[in-house]
């Protein structure tokens, strides 16, 4: 009986072998009755199956049956006990009926068991769950009865199913393997061939069965001890229940038969494989030396452009694709031959090595030719790519040189010059790269004759060489023309830089001169408090005028230079119509203001000098001091100077400009008036000396 047949019944857990043992090493059979009515037929089937598992030796030690009646009725318990007598009378040595806390009528139950004792053939005792340890050790009881033994019914059932499946499959597989192996050991070659066709493959995979067996054996060996706290807990999957030696014996037999089966398969496979290898080797060799070589002989050009080279590459890839299929066959054949050589059969070694050498020579030669052709086309594609990039760079540079631009300022000219230099440098780098690519391609072409298969490729090579050299020479000429044009443009740009610089500096000179004029009118307003200070101011003013004169002369020189540069560049000077009039206008204004400033300072010097002579006490010159004309002259100069301070500077265009602010002019005028008052006071003293004496 197999567990898979009665699986639904076994899942109900009507009875089970927990793996625990009594004090006589007899197995403990547990029947957990429940509130629901127990199906006695199913219980009987379950008991039959469970009692078929242990070995005869184990059965001889007898069973201790625990009937858990705590959730059942007495009549059910009695029926089960009686059924045990019918099912396993010889194997049962003790039946422990676990009673509930509120048990049935003790007299009735005691009377009934005592009455049936001789007929049952085994001892039946009624015991509470907590008193079971009097008959069975706690470590052999499950947790339901207060013990420490762990039992998982579904786990046990699953392992049991695996065990039975393995036993069934391994037994069937052993028969099949024995039939195959025995058929291979006897009979003639024809019978062997026939046996290969009919019985060569077993119904199940031996590897799978062996793996299942090893996993099962490992599980059995590991589950023998799974206790805790130093106690030993016997699992229901130990060697006494599931016959661990039986699994080991089946595995040993399977390994032996499977090893023989593998050898039979290897020998048969080797014979068939050798014939297939010979046939495939000749197919590969014949194709590579025939159609494959013809395809390569027809391809020698490199193309005259990127598109042409790409088309040739695409054609070559198609050829490589066809070859790759045969190379894949070669790799597979080489692996097969190597495997057969490693087998070490002397009778096949010479033939296999010869086939391997012939195949390798042809394939490597053809692969080298394909690689050479691919490298040549790749080099040609790179050469044409560099040539195209260089041509585009030259076109861009030439287009830039052919456009006559009018830069707005020197910065844009510098940027244009920098861009030209960068483009020219990029062209130099591109041309150098083209030469390197071209020389590498020429070197490869010179080696092309070695792969010619006897074909004269002189014409094809000459066309390729002429094309490469022609491209490089053409690029060199175009680059030289661009360099010449760049030199011309560079000279023109530098002249334009000078032109803009002169214009900028001339405009700056106008600004400086305007600033000097502004400073003259706003800050150069003092006339001095005495003659000495006024003379110092006049000297400073002359130096100030020298600076302005230098600035004006510098601006004129710059504008003259712009005229010369414009004539050289054949362009209209912007400065001659704008900057020069402004420069002359500002200079004219500065000249007028400067002359007015000089005139005022000279008048101030004359005024202060005469005033100081009168105001100083000079007894050596009494006649001079008493000269009324001098007083009149001083007074006239002072008044004239005061009037001059109120007069603005008038420019040629009619505009007027005052020196300083009104407060500045008032301060200067007040100083002059004070000096005039002192002179008048001195005059009065000289006219009426007695007034001075009386006052003193």
UniProtKB/Swiss-Prot annotation:
InterPro entries noted in UniProt: CRAL-TRIO_dom, Spectrin_SESTD1
SUPFAM superfamilies (alphabetical): Spectrin repeat
Record's GO cellular component terms: intermediate filament cytoskeleton
Region forming the signal peptide: none
Keywords attached to this entry: Repeat
Tissue-level expression: Broad expression. High expression in thalamus and brain. Significantly expressed in vasculature.
GO-annotated molecular function: phosphatidic acid binding; phosphatidylinositol-3,4-bisphosphate binding; phosphatidylinositol-3,5-bisphosphate binding; phosphatidylinositol-3-phosphate binding; phosphatidylinositol-4,5-bisphosphate binding; phosphatidylinositol-4-phosphate binding; phosphatidylinositol-5-phosphate binding
Pfam families: CRAL_TRIO_2, Spectrin_SESTD1
Domain spans labelled CRAL-TRIO: 1-153
An example Gene Ontology biological process: negative regulation of calcium ion transmembrane transport via high voltage-gated calcium channel
Function statement: May act as the primary docking protein directing membrane turnover and assembly of the transient receptor potential channels TRPC4 and TRPC5. Binds phospholipids such as phosphatidylinositol monophosphates, phosphatidylinositol diphosphates (PIP2s) and phosphatidic acid, but not less polar lipids including phosphatidylcholine, phosphatidylserine, and phosphatidylinositol. The binding to PIP2s is calcium dependent. Might be involved in the plasma membrane localization of CTNNB1.
Subunit-level organization: Interacts (via the spectrin 1 repeat) with TRPC4 and TRPC5 (via CIRB domain). Interacts with CTNNB1.
Other comment: Called SOLO because the encoded protein is related to but shorter than DUO and TRIO.
Similarity field: Belongs to the SOLO family.
UniProt name for this protein: SEC14 domain and spectrin repeat-containing protein 1
Source species taxonomy: Eukaryota, Metazoa, Chordata, Craniata, Vertebrata
């Amino acid at each position: 009986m197999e567990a898979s047949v009665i699986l639904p019944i076994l899942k109900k857990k009507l009875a089970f072998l927990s793996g625990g043992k009594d004090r006589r090493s007899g197995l403990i059979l547990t029947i957990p009755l429940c509130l629901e009515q127990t199906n006695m037929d199913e219980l009987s089937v379950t008991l039959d199956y469970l009692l078929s598992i242990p070995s005869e030796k184990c059965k001889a030690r007898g069973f201790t049956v625990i009937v858990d009646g705590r959730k059942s009725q007495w009549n059910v318990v009695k029926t089960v006990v009686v059924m045990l007598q019918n099912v396993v009378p010889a194997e049962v040595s003790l039946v422990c009926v676990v009673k509930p806390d509120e048990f049935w009528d003790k007299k009735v139950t005691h009377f009934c068991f005592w009455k049936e004792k001789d007929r049952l053939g085994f001892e039946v005792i009624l015991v509470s769950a907590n008193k079971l340890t009097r008959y069975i050790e706690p470590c052999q009881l499950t947790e339901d009865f207060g013990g420490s033994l762990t039992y998982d019914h579904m786990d046990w059932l699953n392992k049991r199913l695996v065990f039975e499946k393995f036993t069934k499959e391994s037994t069937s597989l052993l028969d099949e393997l024995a039939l195959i192996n025995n058929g291979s050991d006897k009979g003639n070659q024809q019978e062997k061939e026939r046996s290969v066709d009919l019985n060569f493959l077993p119904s199940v995979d031996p590897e799978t069965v062996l793996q299942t067996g090893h996993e099962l054996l490992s599980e059995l060996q590991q589950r023998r001890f799974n206790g805790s706290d130093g106690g030993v807990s016997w699992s229901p999957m130990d060697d006494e229940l599931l016959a661990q030696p039986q699994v080991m014996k089946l595995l040993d037999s399977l390994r032996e038969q499977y090893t023989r089966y593998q050898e039979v398969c290897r020998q048969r496979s080797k014979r068939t494989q050798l014939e297939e290898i010979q046939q495939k080797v000749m197919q590969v060799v014949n194709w590579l030396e025939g159609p494959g070589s013809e395809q390569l002989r027809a391809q020698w050009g490199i193309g005259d452009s990127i598109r042409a080279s790409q088309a040739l590459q695409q054609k070559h890839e198609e050829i490589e694709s066809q070859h790759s299929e045969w190379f894949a066959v070669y790799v597979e054949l080489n692996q097969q031959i190597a495997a057969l050589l490693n087998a070490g059969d002397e009778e096949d070694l010479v033939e296999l090595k010869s086939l391997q050498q012939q195949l390798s020579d042809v394939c490597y030669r053809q692969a080298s030719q394909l690689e050479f052709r691919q490298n040549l086309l790749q080099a040609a594609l790179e050469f044409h790519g560099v040539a195209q990039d260089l041509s585009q760079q030259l076109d861009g540079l030439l287009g830039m040189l052919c456009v006559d631009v009018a830069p707005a300022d020197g910065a844009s000219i510098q940027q244009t010059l920098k861009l030209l230099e960068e483009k020219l440098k990029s062209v130099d780098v591109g041309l150098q790269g083209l030469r390197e690519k071209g020389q590498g391609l020429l070197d490869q072409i010179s080696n092309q004759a070695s792969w010619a298969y006897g074909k004269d490729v002189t014409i094809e090579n000459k066309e390729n060489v002429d094309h490469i050299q022609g491209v490089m020479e053409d690029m060199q000429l175009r680059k030289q023309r661009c360099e010449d044009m760049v030199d011309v443009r560079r000279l023109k740009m530098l002249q334009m830089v000078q032109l803009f610089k002169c214009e900028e500096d001339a405009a700056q000179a106008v600004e400086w001169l305007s600033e000097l004029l502004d400073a003259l009118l706003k800050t150069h307003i003092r006339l001095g408090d005495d003659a000495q200070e006024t003379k110092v101011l006049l000297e400073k003013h002359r130096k100030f005028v020298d600076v302005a004169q230098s600035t004006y002369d510098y601006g004129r020189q710059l504008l003259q230079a712009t005229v010369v540069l414009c004539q050289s560049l054949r362009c209209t000077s912007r400065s001659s119509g704008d900057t020069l009039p402004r420069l002359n206008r500002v200079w004219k204004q500065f000249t007028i203001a400067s002359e007015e400033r000089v005139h005022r300072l000279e008048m101030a010097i004359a005024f202060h000098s005469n005033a100081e002579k009168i105001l100083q006490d000079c007894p050596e010159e009494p006649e001079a001091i008493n000269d009324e004309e001098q007083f009149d002259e001083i007074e006239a100069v002072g008044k004239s100077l005061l009037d001059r301070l109120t007069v603005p500077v008038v420019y040629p265009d009619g505009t007027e400009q005052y020196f300083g602010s009104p407060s500045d002019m008032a301060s200067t005028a007040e100083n002059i008036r004070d000096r005039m008052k002192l002179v008048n006071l001195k005059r009065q003293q000289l006219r009426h000396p007695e007034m001075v004496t009386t006052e003193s």
